[in-house]
UniProtKB/Swiss-Prot annotation:
The keyword rRNA processing applies. The lineage of its organism: Bacteria, Pseudomonadati, Pseudomonadota, Gammaproteobacteria, Pasteurellales. One of its GO terms (molecular function) is metal ion binding. This is Ribonuclease 3. The gene is rnc. Mg(2+) binds at residues 39, 112, 115. It is found in: Cytoplasm. Residues 153-223 form the DRBM domain. It comes from the Bacteria. InterPro entries: dsRBD_dom (IPR014720), RNase_III (IPR011907), RNase_III_dom (IPR000999), RNase_III_sf (IPR036389). It comes from Actinobacillus succinogenes (strain ATCC 55618 / DSM 22257 / CCUG 43843 / 130Z). Belongs to the ribonuclease III family.
Amino acid sequence: MKHLDRLQHKIGYEFSNLTLLKQALTHRSAAKVHNERLEFLGDAILNLTIGEALYLQFPHCNEGELSRMRATLVREKTLAELAHQFDLGNYMALGAGELKSGGFRRASILADCVEAIIGAMSLDSNLPKTMEIVRRWYEVLLRDIQPGENQKDPKTRLQEYLQGKRLALPAYNVTDIQGEAHCQTFTVECHVENLDRTFVGVAGSRRKAEQVAAEQILKVLDIK
């Protein structure tokens, strides 16, 4: 498993039980034994790790400021960027349909895989060791983050911008839901007054899909 050796070097952790790593890399479209339970565990550990790091780093910030910074650091976009650093797209096991549709590049799948790897590391070792590795992944991001307006989520920032311009609020509509109840993928379209196009967000929940669409609009409007 030379290719997994390379991946383990990139993430900074060597698995004792490679089966856990393989499961973390397996999307539900590829096998009955997949990474969603590991993702659930990894999500909790990630939030704990980043929450603790921010609590210690910013002793004078209130709960709202800490929550917004944590949301920025654990959001899909940030996790997908970490996945690109690890070249996770080259290691994931995807079903034929997901491969054909470019699932190895999809931010939601990459982000879920990062969380699954965190969950797998915790089962392979222990919580303190896993948190230490995650803090190492986030070293630069934690160093650079600061409380402030840019920590608000995309939907909030878009709404405040439109209100400031006295424009109508965005309209979000779910246009498609795929998958079974416990593992659905939502497609959301968003329309904004004075922008002659439709923006589409796809994610594992309606809320996340709306955030993806809102972030696309912010980019078009050049709002940082």
